[in-house]
Amino acid sequence: MKLFHLADLHFGKYIHGYSMIEMGDQPFWIQQFLKKTDELGPDAILIAGDVYDRAVPSKEAVNLFNDFLTELAMRKIPVIMIAGNHDSGTRLAFGDKLFCKQGVYIAGEIQKNVQCVSLQDEYGKVNFWLVPYLFPAAVNEILNRNDLKDYDTAMRALLEEQSIHKEERNVILSHQFVTASGEKPVMGGSETTVGGIGQIDGDVFSEFDYVALGHIHNAQKMGKETVRYAGSPLSYHFSERNQNKGLTVVELKEKGQVSVYIEEIPVLHEMIEVSGTMEELLQTDIKEKSYVRAVIKQEMLPPQAVETLRNYLPQKTVF
């Protein structure tokens, strides 16, 4: 079974006041993703949270995601998704019972009985466990407890309640801050406070054949190859410009046989940072269609410096 693992789409994202929908970045990414989908033919698409950038998304963001889901449904590819901390779980899961009849499965809020979606391939059943963003108080409430004080114990308690058939292949979707034996994931500038949300050690997922994580924008494994953050498809901060962006492809064969690789997906605008004196910046050769962060290094800032740079770089957006 071939899976596309996505996360942190952040539809409706603004960067320095510019809409990534209006600037074309997110619609362009969807076009390129659909081309890759037609080329590689995944059996299912996983979205591990933060579909939207805000709990109350804009009309444009909702329309964009609606078009995206419609294209995937037309291709009859199952879509399995959870809510992240940026999403409103209730809003994201609106109409979930109707959507599941079209092969779109959404878990918006934590439940005592974790939603499980099962798909078949030539090797048998694959069970997908959908755990949207959780916090201890919510788990205490649904389990009728009051002793779960941190995120790690809350996740362990929730998973202990589930009947997981270990002889079958199991995949979990989670949107949390996951560490590997205390080692934290590599983050970017748009995630400066994410580490304070609460850590979960990756060994809590030991019973799962693949762990599809969201929450961190840099694509990376956490300890094992099969515990992975997909990362955001686009750079959402200039500090993310050198991060690994692409599409995480997972192939499940027989129990215990999992392979993972990254497919490149073109982006509309690259993020570039340049620095120097005004004279040096005006001589810099920069690729067309780029978002440029220009750092002027001189004691006196020239008058109308930003306007001058924008006139010099007419096909680029200067911040």
Locations of regions flagged by a protein language model:
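Short, surface-exposed connector motifs at secondary-structure boundaries
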Residues: 73-81, 288-290
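A conserved active-site cap/scaffold subdomain adjacent to cofactor or substrate pockets
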Residues: 202, 209-265
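His/Asp/Glu-rich metal-coordinating catalytic cores
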Residues: 57, 74, 83, 87-223
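N-terminal active-site segment of His-dependent metallophosphoesterases
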Residues: 1-70, 74, 172
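Divalent metal-coordination and catalytic microenvironments
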Residues: 8, 50, 65, 84, ...
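Short amphipathic alpha-helical segments and helix-helix/interface helices
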Residues: 66-70, 96, 159-160, 201-205, ...
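Accessory, non-catalytic peripheral segments of nucleic-acid enzymes
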Residues: 39, 44, 252-319
